[in-house]
Swiss-Prot record:
Protein name in the entry: Chaperone protein DnaJ
Complexes and interactors: Homodimer.
Zn-finger region bounds: CR-type: 139-217
CXXCXGXG motif repeats: 152-159, 169-176, 191-198, 205-212
Gene name linked to the record: dnaJ
Source organism of the structure: Paraburkholderia phytofirmans (strain DSM 17436 / LMG 22146 / PsJN)
GO-annotated molecular function: ATP binding; heat shock protein binding; unfolded protein binding; zinc ion binding
SMART domains: DnaJ (SM00271)
Source organism, top-level taxon: Bacteria
Binding of Zn(2+) 1, residues: C152, C155, C205, C208
Length: 379
């Protein structure tokens, strides 16, 4: 089944700004999040589709590649394999992207026809990490175990058996590319024997089987900064896959996903919560306590408060990564109707209702206004 256009998935224009793309992603991710749609396979599929679209369009290089070549330009299945459970950023258009960006992701740095082994930068890796809202707000240090490729200790990354060394490729004479002519046309292609490295290995290393790298699990320290938001990435330089022929290692990108909170809903640096209050407090007013990420806070509910009223507590939200002050906490009160009343309680409420009726409409102005608008339906 053909993939949908990434801009169509997020519902944005092709010239949408980074902020518009991020806003659209947040809205759709919240709508289709599996925690909000348990057991809903359609929602799960939409969530994955939205996440994939945002990963591509939020990265300037991948967005440029997608704009020019479509899905083929960013399809990881057409490039080198990354570590298990990770998304590699390499692609099958190294020569084309090398001209556009100077160096292909996970590919070789081109040298303007210069002979010699091609130097390859290691592929970038991606690691998804779930954290709580409290951890996102306050920040913390943690460790992650990352399955990755590392340079082989036996051959020191050369891929050759100890005591031997890679030799210059006889097909391309070490340039990593060959030129094929057909009629008036001449095309330069990656060497089929050495695959662009400029060398080949007569006697491969028995430990890594000539790859020059082996898979192992690394433990890395990760510092989660206070105020980080859902979908943001932390870059760990040099902790991606190792380079080839002395090339630099790629980077590791830790993508943050914040778990749904039982009380709060985040909107940027602001927090929202729904809070039930007794109908007596709503009618008479009073002081109530609310939870915040920093502890308890209190505010006064004025008498006559209606259900759905929103109260703003300044500075009780989250201090974002780029903010000098914290956001606000919005408390949406819901007036709770008492249930399972005893007979004495029922009698008291009936007496109260009678007193309200005798007092006229001044006690229930909204009811009077509503009945005035609909009385024609009952005539």
């Amino acid at each position: 089944m053909a993939k949908r256009d990434y801009y169509e998935v997020l519902g944005v224009a092709k010239n949408a700004s980074d902020d518009e793309i991020k806003k659209a992603y947040r809205k759709l991710a919240m709508k289709h999040h599996p925690d909000r749609n348990p057991g809903n396979k359609d929602a799960e599929g939409h969530f994955k589709e939205v996440k994939e679209a945002y990963e591509m369009l939020s990265d300037s290089q991948k967005r440029a590649a997608y704009d020019q070549y479509g899905h083929a330009g960013v399809d990881p299945n057409m490039g080198g394999a990354g570590a298990q459970g990770f998304g590699g950023f390499a692609d099958a258009f190294g020569d084309i992207f090398g001209d556009i960006f100077g160096q292909a992701a996970g590919g070789a740095a081109r040298g303007g026809g210069r002979a010699g082994p091609q130097v390859y930068r290691g592929a970038d890796l991606r690691y998804s990490m779930e954290i709580t809202l409290e951890q996102a707000a306050h920040g913390y240090d943690t460790q992650i175990r990352v399955p990755s490729w590392v340079s082989c200790e036996i051959c020191h990354g050369s891929g050759a058996k100890p005591g031997t060394k890679p030799e210059t490729c006889p097909t391309c004479s070490g340039s990593g590319s060959v030129r094929m002519s057909q009629g008036f046309f001449s095309i330069q292609q990656t060497c089929p024997k050495c695959h662009g490295t400029g060398t080949y290995i007569p006697e491969p290393c028995g430990h890594c089987h000539g790859a020059g790298k082996v898979k192992e699990t690394k433990t890395l320290e990760v510092k989660i900064p206070a105020g980080i938001d859902d979908g943001m990435r932390i870059r760990s330089a040099g902790n991606g896959e190792p380079g080839i022929n002395g090339g630099p290692s790629g980077d590791l990108y830790v993508e943050i996903h914040i778990k749904q909170h039982s009380v709060f809903e985040r909107d940027g640096d602001d927090l929202h919560c729904q809070m039930p209050i007794p109908f007596t407090t709503a009618a008479l007013g009073g002081e109530i306590e609310v939870p915040t990420l920093a502890g308890r806070a209190s505010f006064t509910v004025p008498e006559g408060t209606q259900s759905g009223k929103t109260f703003r507590l300044r500075g009780k939200g989250i201090k974002g990564l780029r903010s000098s002050i914290a956001g606000d906490l919005y408390v949406h009160v819901q007036v709770e109707t008492p249930v399972k009343l005893t007979e004495p309680q029922r009698d008291l409420l009936k007496q109260f209702e009678k007193a309200l009726v005798e007092g006229g409409s001044r006690h229930s102005p909204q009811s009077k206004s509503w009945f005035d608008r609909v009385k024609s339906f009952f005539d």
